[in-house]
Amino acid sequence: MSSCKPVVVITLLLSMQRLYAADWYVSPDGAATNAGTRQSPWDIGSALGGREEIKAGDTICLLERTYRRRPNELFDVRLKGLADQPIHVRPAPGQRARIDGGLAVQSPSSHVWIHDLEIFVSEPLPDKPVSAGSSPADLKRPWGGLHMHGGTGCKYINLVIHNCNQGISCWKDEIDPEVYGCIIYDNGWVGVDRGHGHCIYTQNDEGVKTISNCIMTCPFDGSYTLHAYGSERAYVNNYLVTDNICYGKGPFLIGGGRPSHGIRVYRNYLHGVGMRIGYSAPYNEDCDVRENVIVNGRLEIANYRKAVQQDNVVLAGNAARPMGAKSILLPNKYDPNRLYLAVYNWGKADTVDVKTGGLLRDGDTVELLDPRNVFGDPVARATCRGDTIRIPVQGEFAAYVLRVSRK
């Protein structure tokens, strides 16, 4: 009987920790010496940097306003949660938190979930192309964005990242992250050689990097929506890339100079964006590429010893189109009132009827938002009738964020 007592005590302690998980508050004019309450908030740097009493299971709430620091615009994140008690970083309920700069996730961060923040750089781009290369001295603006250097089991959920020099960087020492539901647009700059900066630039070896349910578009030729790439000295292994919407400009690449393995690419929806799996490596091991839709672009799979291709739809710009329309409505596993929609409007009709597949009920209403203006006014509104919503579409393709109000 006595051998069971430590188990009971440990279980009780864990239950009490979950019960007493705390909400802490930060604001742009907070201070490290404050109490971390709504009335006496911390500053963002000390809270995210692990210099406060934040424990596994706690939540850091960012009070509404803009968080900005110059120089050193990236706020370090050094927080340690547990797999079953992550630390959450998010806006205070009902508020909008903006980071004019960015975040850098550093070791020993673990099991941190960063939700619903807007990350951007307010300084304008130069009015003419700057010097060639990836680090031009005459660019002269903060880098901004979200940069992952050393977290384990962290999640980056429903972030809006725009007008940075690079949207997301996710490097080899970031283990088992999930990038989910992020809207990434208008990042990068123009050099005299080409466009630079990508929606997501990433490398990986150990663990699996998951990139799912994101909407990505680039403003410049030379930038990539997904740039999972490295030289012969870098690693591009073990990716799960699913249910993303990429359009406009910005090729979708997974591959580099070193052989890759463990590449899985499922149900991505591209328009005006080509997909390339494999780059300059003399050989690659295994990839699984299924159920992707690529319109006005190509699918290239290069130098794989084992490549599974199944149920992909690839239509070049001059290829015959099907009749009618194809719509893809994606649920959001972290926010039931957020949906993403991609529409291939083959017939170029003014409106398209979209089947909701049970994601909406009769009487539910949605606001359709432009992904590049998700905090602005809706493009349109619609009400679900008979498991269907009718939406406006201009041209062959449209992408929307749907904000749902349940009946």
Regions found by a protein language model. Name each.
Residues G324-R361:
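Carbohydrate-binding surface patches
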Residues N72-V77, D100-A104, D127-M148, N163-K172, ...:
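Extracellular beta-strand/beta-solenoid scaffold signature
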Residues V26-E64, R68-R69:
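Acidic Gly/Asp/Thr-rich repetitive segments characteristic of extracellular carbohydrate-active
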Residues L63, P86, A92-P93, S110-V121, ...:
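Right-handed parallel beta-helix
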Residues P28, C61-L74, R78-P142, G188:
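Right-handed parallel beta-helix/beta-spiral solenoid domain characteristic of secreted/periplasmic
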Residues R385-K407:
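C-terminal beta-strand-rich structural cap/linker in extracellular carbohydrate-active enzymes
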Residues V7-S15:
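Bacterial N-terminal signal peptides
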